């Protein structure tokens, strides 16, 4: 009888705590964290919380199969970390650069088009995950890619040592 009473008290305490705390909510990111480079000229844009959430969802849908954790499964030397994006030609360390890449991907040095082997809007007939993505969707995905180093630090694009 006493054990049952203890169990009821503990269950009541846990449920009361749950009501007070509320349901689990996503981490609220401040404006400074959500501000990412817009273009190569240095302009910036602050992503809305909706864009952050949508960018994560779309990245998981269309990109994470090959780029989980910001690495590139097919080429471990080139990931989605800020340094690699900045050294690409043209630069991919901003929203416009990444959107351009998702529309028409090129090799790291920018010399050859690789839309036949990398998902893009240009190759949406081959890579169906890209088929219904809009420019707004691509901007959200790019925002997600640029935001992750601010949240995860070196773990984003860090490779096997972190996963």
Swiss-Prot record:
Binds 1 heme c group covalently per subunit. GO terms for molecular function: electron transfer activity; heme binding; iron ion binding. Its cofactor is heme c. It holds the Pfam family Cytochrom_C550. Its main location: membrane. GO terms for biological process: photosynthesis, light reaction; respiratory electron transport chain. It is a peripheral membrane protein. Heme c binds at residues 63, 66-67, 118. GO terms for cellular component: photosystem II; plasma membrane-derived thylakoid membrane. It is found in: Cellular thylakoid membrane. SUPFAM superfamilies: Cytochrome c. Keywords: Electron transport, Heme, Iron, Membrane, Metal-binding, Photosynthesis, Photosystem II, Signal, Thylakoid, Transport. Residues 1-26 form the signal peptide. InterPro entries: Cyt_c-like_dom (IPR009056), Cyt_c-like_dom_sf (IPR036909), Cytochrom_C550 (IPR029490), PsbV_cyt_c550 (IPR017851), PsbV_cyt_c550-like (IPR016003). Gene3D superfamilies: Cytochrome c-like domain (1.10.760.10). One of the extrinsic, lumenal subunits of photosystem II (PSII). PSII is a light-driven water plastoquinone oxidoreductase, using light energy to abstract electrons from H(2)O, generating a proton gradient subsequently used for ATP formation. The extrinsic proteins stabilize the structure of photosystem II oxygen-evolving complex (OEC), the ion environment of oxygen evolution and protect the OEC against heat-induced inactivation. Low-potential cytochrome c that plays a role in the OEC of PSII. Belongs to the cytochrome c family. PsbV subfamily. PSII is composed of 1 copy each of membrane proteins PsbA, PsbB, PsbC, PsbD, PsbE, PsbF, PsbH, PsbI, PsbJ, PsbK, PsbL, PsbM, PsbT, PsbX, PsbY, PsbZ, Psb30/Ycf12, peripheral proteins PsbO, CyanoQ (PsbQ), PsbU, PsbV and a large number of cofactors. It forms dimeric complexes. This is Photosystem II extrinsic protein V.
């Amino acid at each position: 009888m006493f054990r049952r009473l203890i169990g009821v008290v503990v269950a009541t305490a846990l449920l009361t705590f749950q009501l007070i705390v509320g349901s689990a909510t996503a981490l609220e990111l401040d404006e400074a964290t959500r501000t990412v480079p817009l273009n190569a000229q240095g302009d910036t844009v602050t992503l809305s919380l909706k864009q952050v959430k949508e960018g994560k969802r779309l990245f998981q849908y269309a990109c994470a199969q090959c780029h989980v954790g910001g690495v590139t499964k097919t080429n471990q030397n080139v990931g989605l970390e800020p340094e690699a994006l900045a050294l690409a030609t043209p630069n991919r360390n901003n929203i416009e650069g990444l959107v351009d890449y998702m529309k028409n991907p090129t090799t790291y040095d920018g010399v050859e088009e690789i839309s036949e082997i990398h998902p893009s809007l240009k190759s949406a007939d081959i890579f169906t995950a890209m088929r219904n993505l809009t420019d707004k969707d691509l901007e959200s995905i790019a925002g997600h890619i640029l935001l992750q180093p601010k949240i995860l630090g070196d773990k984003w694009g860090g490779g096997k040592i972190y996963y």
